[in-house]
Structure formats: C-alpha cells, structure tokens
Amino acid sequence: MRQPVEQTSRDAVLVEDAHVRPMMGFEILEPLPARSVPYERVDPFILVHEARFRLSELQDVDTKHPHRGFDNLWYILQGSASTGHSTGPGGTIERARPPEGALLALRTGAGAWHAEAIGAEQREEGLGDTEWRSVLFWVNLARKDKQSEPSAQVLLPERMTVRKEGDATVRVLVGEGSPVELGTPATVLDIGFPDGGEVTTPVPPGYQGFAYVLDGEAVFGANRRPARPPQLVLLGPGEELMVTDAVPGTRFLLMAGRPYGEVPVFNGPYVD
C-alpha cells in the first residue's frame, strides 16, 4: 500500500486581510483574531495588532490597562516611545523607553499593568511629529502557568541575533539566539528583503503559525500565494517556509510555535 508523502515545504493555506479596529481613540490594524482563522489553527498565538501614528496624537490618551494569563510582546518598528509596566505589588509603573528595533516582552502571568506609547517625553523633546509604528502580539500561556510571577525584559536591537538567509536579512526576536523565552517553544522572526529576492527558512515541524506582511509584496508557500500589507498568511504543516518574488523593501514577521492544545477563555485583557 502506498504511504502518503509528508510535505516538507509549507503551503500558504489562507491569505487574509487585516481589519481596522478602533482602540484607545485610534484605529489600528488587527490581523488576528480573524473570523476565518480559528484559534486552534494558530495556537499558541492569540492576537496581533499593528499601530501607526504620530506621537503628538497620544497627548490626551491614557493607555494604562491590566493584563493576565499570556505573554505580551511589543516590537518597535519605527520611532521610539516610552512605555510602562508593573510586575510587582502595588501597581507601581516602571518606565522604559525602548528604541527603534527593540522588543519588550512582558509575562503577564497572574496579573500586570501595561501602558503603551506614553509620548510625553518625546513631545517635550520636540519629537511629537515623529511617526511611530509597532506590532503588539499576545502568546498564550499554559493553564498551569497562568498564575506565574509576572516579569518583563527589553531586548535591544544591538543584542538581537541578525543573520543572512538567502536574499533576506533575518532578525531573531524569539527562538534560537534570542534570550526571550515564551511559555512554549516558538520562533518569531523579522524577515526583510532590502534588494528583493527569495528565502527558504526553517520552521520546526509541529509548530503552527503565520506570516504577517508589513511592507512590499512576495509569494508565500510551496503553493505560491501572493501577499501584501496588511495581510496574514496562514501556514500549513511542514518543516520550512519558502518565500519568492519579494520586491525590494519587502518585510514580514514570521510567528510559529508549538500549540498547547488547550482552549483559552478570553475575557477582554485577560486570557484564562
């Protein structure tokens, strides 16, 4: 009897446009969650938001809010903005100012406060008209870890592992070479094509995930599905992702991780 052949190179099984969502007085792009992408297809990833605006627009916005039960990662694509978080008792906000290219990783665990893009310092320095762009994503924690101690760390761009793969420049946010660890084995990569071209990058078998296109356009997967911003490309099973025909300046985030196989309970800023 002929045995089925396992596919090595992953297909792009779905290409989905991000939708616009109002949040804290702004409009942001929300590629995930999406109605056509059930959580069990992207487990352990819960949410992805892309925000883009000028810091002066933050003047009258209070972004302080609580979280619980997941890893909250905030990647600064452009500009620099202050942020705040509280991981200890009393709710005291600790300030940080991650520069462009930095990653803030907040383990919310049993509960933490967070405030994105506090722009007062930048306005005082005359930087209010600076354009700011970031991606925020939530990654679930196992139910056994949801009451863990909250913690935070900033991965600066100069400490980030950067490597060349094919025609692409790959920055490792999470995965081999990064000090940032999630509750489950995962890889989060910023992949860019300064001059266009192609790349085939490993994605461990058993991981579930997707690509989110930030700039440019390219063809994704063994089945060659074109995608452009702001589209999410859901990946099928396999051991690698092939991306071809990238135009110069193309950039996307690759997010993949080992699923928990648990059904989380979503309750606003909490994931139980």
Predicted features along the sequence, with ranges:
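Jelly-roll (double-stranded beta-helix
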Residues: 1-272
